[in-house]
């Protein structure tokens, strides 16, 4: 399945929440009407069945982190094999993706832009260039912009937006050096309350 490259507002309106697919220069609510489904005649959303709700939650999570179905299913299988809550394990695995950490550190204004920075070789982990977006970042890893990429306007602009927005508690960023530390693996309480990961577990458990 190909990666979606169409209007980002369409995806956000489909799920009814901000999926952080836009740059954050303006609030998503000012760009996308979250109260209406996509389409010219998108009206109120109908009541979903249990299965429909589970499917929507899976789509919301996949679209937030920019992961396709096969890879998402592999994350679920890995989460099942780990100790603890499968749903929480799944969220943490997604949070540890390098493209997500690059986004959290403010080097990319969106996860899609962060993924592109990784694939283009602009990012280092512990001083070594890594070009795999799905690379799993571990606690205390140092994630930096490579020296030859630090003059890119898009990275500088993204960092300015990130400084205004603020950084999450589990990372520490030195914006001047374009370097940050993934201090710890986040806990469930740190992550979005808009996600109901138990519905995703129910869907895949059938």
Swiss-Prot record:
Say yes or no: keyword rRNA-binding present: yes
rRNA-binding as UniProt keyword: yes
Q: Which keywords annotate this record?
A: Ribonucleoprotein, Ribosomal protein, RNA-binding, rRNA-binding
Q: Quick one: where's region Disordered?
A: 27-47
Among the GO biological process terms of this entry, one is: translation
Transmembrane regions listed in the UniProt entry: none
InterPro entries, sorted: Ribosomal_uS4 (IPR022801), Ribosomal_uS4_bac-type (IPR005709), Ribosomal_uS4_CS (IPR018079), Ribosomal_uS4_N (IPR001912), S4_RNA-bd (IPR002942), S4_RNA-bd_sf (IPR036986)
Positions of the S4 RNA-binding domain: 96-158
- Show the GO cellular component annotation of the record: small ribosomal subunit
Q: What is an example of a Pfam family matching this protein?
A: Ribosomal_S4
Role this protein plays: One of the primary rRNA binding proteins, it binds directly to 16S rRNA where it nucleates assembly of the body of the 30S subunit. With S5 and S12 plays an important role in translational accuracy.
- Share what the entry says about its subunit structure, partners included: Part of the 30S ribosomal subunit. Contacts protein S5. The interaction surface between S4 and S5 is involved in control of translational fidelity.
According to its UniProt record, which protein family does this protein belong to? Belongs to the universal ribosomal protein uS4 family.
Concerning HAMAP family, the annotation shows:
Ribosomal_uS4_B
Q: What is this protein called?
A: Small ribosomal subunit protein uS4
Organism expressing this protein natively? Dichelobacter nodosus (strain VCS1703A)
| Name of the encoding gene | rpsD
């Amino acid at each position: 399945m190909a990666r979606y490259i169409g209007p980002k507002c369409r995806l956000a309106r489909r799920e009814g929440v901000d999926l952080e697919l836009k740059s954050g220069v303006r609030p998503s609510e000012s760009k996308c009407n979250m109260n209406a489904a996509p389409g010219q005649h998108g009206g109120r959303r109908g009541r979903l069945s249990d299965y429909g709700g589970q499917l929507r939650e899976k789509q919301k999570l996949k679209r937030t982190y920019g992961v396709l179905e096969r890879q998402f299913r592999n994350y679920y299988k890995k989460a099942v094999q780990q100790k603890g809550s499968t749903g929480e394990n799944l969220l943490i695995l997604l949070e540890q993706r390098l493209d997500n950490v690059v986004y959290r550190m403010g080097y990319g204004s969106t996860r899609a832009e962060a993924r592109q920075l990784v694939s283009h070789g602009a990012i280092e982990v512990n001083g070594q260039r890594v070009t795999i977006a799905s690379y799993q970042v571990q606690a205390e890893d140092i994630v930096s912009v490579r020296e030859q990429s630090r003059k890119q306007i898009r990275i500088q602009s993204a960092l300015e937006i990130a400084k205004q927005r603020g950084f999450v508690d589990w990372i520490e960023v030195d914006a001047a050096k374009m370097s940050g530390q993934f201090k710890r693996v986040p806990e469930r309480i740190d992550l979005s309350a808009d996600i109901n990961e138990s519905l995703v577990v129910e869907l895949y458990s059938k």
